[in-house]
Amino acid sequence: MSWDSYVDNLIAQSKDASGTTHCDKACIIGKDGSAWTTMPTSDTSNNLKLTPEEMANIAKCFKSKDFAAFMSSGIYVNGTKYQFLREEDSKLVLGKKKGEGSLTLQSSKTAIVIGHCPEGGQQGNLNKAVGVIAEYLESLSM
């Protein structure tokens, strides 16, 4: 099964009423730290590029529901450190880096959906789009 179409759907879901897209890149990883979407070899793809170490660290925090590592060391995605803003219900994590944009990470039963909002975009639209995909996966017991 190709999960890359879910990234395209997530990006489309982030559009506001004027048609502006508030998500430029996204990916889905498993709670076991595996890549579900294709990890691109360049930055030209809509898919976020995470290293195996970044995926493992993110998965570990969500699986254990312990976000202390994010609080103390930040959230690393594509080699960039994002400041941890908050977590909600051990399922949703928000991060931000000035000049880079913001991150929304939301887990389902077996997956973590990660979206990136470019600087100047509306993270609220990103949160909604990530939530739609994560909740859909949850409804499939995934």
Swiss-Prot record:
CDD domains: PROF. The keyword Nucleotide-binding does not apply. It is found in: Cytoplasm, Cytoskeleton. GO terms for biological process: regulation of cellular component organization. SMART domains: PROF (SM00392). Its main location: cytoplasm. One of its GO terms (molecular function) is actin monomer binding. PROSITE patterns: PROFILIN. The keyword Glycoprotein does not apply. Expressed specifically in coelomocytes in response to injury. Disulfide bonds: none annotated. Keywords: Actin-binding, Cytoplasm, Cytoskeleton. GO terms for cellular component: cell cortex; cytoskeleton. Pfam families: Profilin. Occurs in many kinds of cells as a complex with monomeric actin in a 1:1 ratio. Belongs to the profilin family. Binds to actin and affects the structure of the cytoskeleton. At high concentrations, profilin prevents the polymerization of actin, whereas it enhances it at low concentrations. By binding to PIP2, it inhibits the formation of IP3 and DG. This is Profilin. The lineage of its organism: Eukaryota, Metazoa, Echinodermata, Eleutherozoa, Echinozoa.
